[in-house]
């Protein structure tokens, strides 16, 4: 049976890791990815609607993202939403589809993206350490109240530390993969 402290720590750390992976997936890297459009909303009949719910998004060629709306009347709305975003891309509307051509990023731009990815991962590490601190505090409180023997508390502290180290190592791996993806061009 898994101890409730370990279970809680593992679940919270796992959610943190998933959140960081999701943030990194949405990050622009110079390589076309439909995920970067997930945050862009189009005012569709008065409802802010994500682009991926209004169109098919695919990668065409090496540096082009193609957005093909199911309803052609939203083409200009999608174009306007992309222009208003902070993506820094110029949509090309040919009347049927919108093309987003990703220019080759400069070395300086890539280094900026790597720095941003590192900041995101560092935030994740801080969150993991805060989870550790929170769980260790609960263990100490239970120990003081006599609910957990000292030996068990020490064992739990060691297990929580191992879990923390494991998740921080996973965050480092995620960062290295993202860094490689950014610098690959």
Swiss-Prot record:
Broad class of where this protein is predominantly found: cytoplasm
The UniProt record lists the keyword Protein biosynthesis: yes
GO BP, sorted A to Z: translation; translational termination
A single Gene Ontology CC term: cytoplasm
Pfam families: RRF
Keywords of the record: Cytoplasm, Protein biosynthesis
Matching InterPro entries: Ribosome_recyc_fac (IPR002661), Ribosome_recyc_fac_dom (IPR023584), RRF_sf (IPR036191)
Family: Belongs to the RRF family.
Name the UniProt record assigns to this protein: Ribosome-recycling factor
Species this protein is from: Thermotoga maritima (strain ATCC 43589 / DSM 3109 / JCM 10099 / NBRC 100826 / MSB8)
Lineage, highest ranks first: Bacteria, Thermotogati, Thermotogota, Thermotogae, Thermotogales
Gene name tied to this protein: frr
């Amino acid at each position: 049976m898994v101890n409730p402290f370990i279970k809680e720590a593992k679940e919270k750390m796992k959610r943190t890791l998933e959140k960081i992976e999701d943030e990194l997936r949405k990050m622009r890297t110079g390589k076309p990815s439909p995920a970067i459009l997930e945050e862009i909303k189009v005012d569709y009949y008065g409802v802010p609607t994500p682009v991926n719910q209004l169109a098919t998004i695919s990668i065409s060629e090496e540096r082009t993202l193609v957005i093909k709306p199911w309803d052609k009347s939203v083409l200009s709305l999608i174009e306007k939403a992309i222009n208003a975003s902070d993506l820094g891309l110029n949509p090309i509307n040919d009347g049927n589809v919108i093309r987003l051509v990703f220019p080759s990023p400069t070395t300086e731009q890539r280094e900026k993206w790597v720095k941003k990815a590192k900041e995101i991962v560092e935030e994740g590490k801080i969150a993991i350490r805060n989870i550790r601190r929170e769980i260790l505090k609960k263990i100490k409180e239970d120990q003081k109240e006599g609910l957990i023997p000292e030996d068990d508390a020490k064992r739990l502290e060691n297990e929580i530390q191992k879990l923390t180290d494991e998740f921080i190592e996973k965050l480092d791996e995620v960062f290295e993969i993202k860094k490689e993806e950014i610098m690959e061009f």
